[in-house]
Amino acid sequence: MREPSAELIIDIDRIRNNIIYLKSLLKPDTKFMAILKANAYGHGLNIISKSIDDLVDGYGLVRLEEATSVRKYTSKKILLMQGVYSEDDFKIAYDNKFDLVVHNKNQLFAFENSDINIWLKVNTGMNRLGFLPEEIISLHKLYDLDKRKYVLMSHLACSDNPKDQLNEKQFKSFDQLADSLEANFESSEDQTLVIKIFSLGIHFL
């Protein structure tokens, strides 16, 4: 009796064409980040990232080991999507110029360094990672975030179904928070910094 077998064939040209097509749907100045967590979803992190590096503006990864591996052959932005939890890991992230997601209170020490790019995650309805909107307001005041640049981000729970009503609720919650933060910023003394707003939803390889 023959053993069952399976073969996965990865077509790099099709992956590249997918990215080119997706970018054609976006405004010309829109940045494109490739989310390649979990070994590029099992496709092979190194071969995929090297093959698409000329098409993307950065990478989203979870494990520090994967991020340092990709950094060896690209200078583009690398986002650690679940941040770091220790001072040692923070130093590695800092030395490699990684951006960090901050999504819980155990990661707030990252705000003590003003030279690292922070993406502050707000839970608008997915209920997996991130601070509640009212917690973001408190953090904004506690850490004087109107004095530094950071990215406000969220994650759509139903991005595969554009008609789902939860999407609209999440966007509304996100926009309300962003408007509130911008209002606080505009009333501050320093007018040279800008709060960057970014809504993370659909993951494309």
Predicted regions and their residues:
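Histidine- and/or cysteine-centered catalytic micro-motif in compact active-site loops
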Residues: T192
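Active-site-proximal beta-alpha core segment in soluble small-molecule metabolic enzymes
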Residues: R2, A6-I10, R14-N17, T30-S180, ...
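Terminal domain-start leader segments
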Residues: L25-K27
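Ligand-binding/active-site lining segments
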Residues: E186
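Active-site loop ensemble at the mouth of alpha/beta enzyme cores that anchors a bound cofactor
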Residues: K196-L205
